Amino acid sequence: SCGYPCSHCGIPGCYPG
């Protein structure tokens, strides 16, 4: 989890949390 939306993560398969 990135802790922010995938659209801001830039990493495929990522999710908020």
Curated annotation (Swiss-Prot):
May have neurotoxic activities. Does not show any effect on voltage-gated potassium channels (10 uM of toxin tested), and on nicotinic acetylcholine receptors (5 uM of toxin tested). Does not show antibacterial activity on both Gram-negative and Gram-positive bacteria. Negative results: does not show effect on Kv1.1, Kv1.2, Kv1.3, Kv1.4, Kv1.5, and Kv1.6. Does not show effect on muscular (alpha-1-beta-1-delta-epsilon) and neuronal alpha-7, alpha-4-beta-4, and alpha-3-beta-4 nAChRs. Coiled coil: none annotated. It is found in: Secreted. One of its GO terms (cellular component) is extracellular region. GO terms for molecular function: toxin activity. The modification Glycine amide is found at G17. Expressed by the venom duct. The lineage of its organism: Eukaryota, Metazoa, Spiralia, Lophotrochozoa, Mollusca. Contains 2 disulfide bonds. Keywords: Amidation, Disulfide bond, Neurotoxin, Secreted, Toxin. The cysteine framework is XIV (C-C-C-C). This is Conotoxin Asi14a.
